[in-house]
Swiss-Prot record:
Keyword vocabulary terms for this entry: Ribonucleoprotein, Ribosomal protein, RNA-binding, rRNA-binding
Annotated PANTHER family: 50S RIBOSOMAL PROTEIN L3, LARGE RIBOSOMAL SUBUNIT PROTEIN UL3C
InterPro entries: Ribosomal_uL3, Ribosomal_uL3_bac/org-type, Ribosomal_uL3_CS, Transl_B-barrel_sf
Full protein name: Large ribosomal subunit protein uL3
Single GO MF annotation: rRNA binding
UniProt xrefs under Gene3D superfamilies: 3.30.160.810, Translation factors (2.40.30.10)
Species per Swiss-Prot/TrEMBL record: Chlorobaculum tepidum (strain ATCC 49652 / DSM 12025 / NBRC 103806 / TLS) (Chlorobium tepidum)
Lineage: superkingdom: Bacteria
Region (Disordered): 127-166
Length: 209
């Protein structure tokens, strides 16, 4: 069991024993540090708050800088909570969580924010087929079509798929296999893709399935 925060470096490929190319994602995972320990008595649940990265103290608010100072750490780029059950042993504020909490062959879930695509139409956003390319039409190639009848129901139903902001949402990719762990450089290599662009922050947790 384990949990750690990290930064997506990018994708590459590794070759397995059968000389097959395996697409992989390289993640700079940790070292993370515990900034706060949540307890049932005080907070109603048990968790560790982890921090990752290092940030100029001038660029964070004073309350947040004080929060990090209480743990004896410099301000980081990201804070996130993980359940105590995911980390073996008891940790105190200021303790380090290294990358070798995971080992090769472990299955993990990776949580991140997907790439933002901006305002997108229904063909790109919802995979609509668009209108006919012939029979006299001139401007309906990528149109959504009817979104509601005139007399009945005289309205557009809630949840109707339309154009709008695409991407930039929280996403969890489950059951990715860890192909390689490199403690000396704090890198984890997982099989497959993870959410988000390069240099985006992700959370890696052991799968419970």
């Amino acid at each position: 069991m384990g949990a750690i925060l990290g930064k997506k470096i990018g994708m590459t490929r590794l070759y397995n024993d059968k000389r097959e190319a395996v697409p992989c994602t390289v993640i700079q995972a940790g070292p993370c540090y515990v900034t706060q320990v949540k307890s049932t008595e005080k907070d109603g649940y048990e968790a560790y708050q982890l921090g990752f990265g290092e940030r100029d103290e001038k660029k964070v608010s004073k309350p947040l800088a004080g929060h990090y100072k209480k743990a004896g750490k410099n301000p980081g780029y990201i804070l996130s909570e993980v359940s105590k059950s995911l980390i073996v042993g008891e940790l105190e504020a200021g303790a380090t969580v290294p990358v070798d909490v995971f080992k090769e062959g472990d299955k993990v879930n990776v949580l991140g924010v997907t790439k933002g695509k901006g305002f997108a139409g229904v063909v790109k956003r919802h995979n609509f087929g668009g209108g006919s390319r012939t029979h006299g039409q001139s401007d309906r190639l990528r149109a959504p079509g009817s979104v509601g009848g005139s007399s009945d129901p005289s309205r557009t139903f809630k949840g109707t798929r339309m154009a709008g902001r695409m991407g930039g949402k929280n996403k969890t990719v489950q059951n990715l296999v860890i192909v390689k762990v490199m403690p000396e450089s704090n890198l984890i290599v997982v099989k497959g893709a993870v959410p988000g662009p390069k240099n985006s922050y992700v959370k890696i947790v052991s799968t419970t399935k």
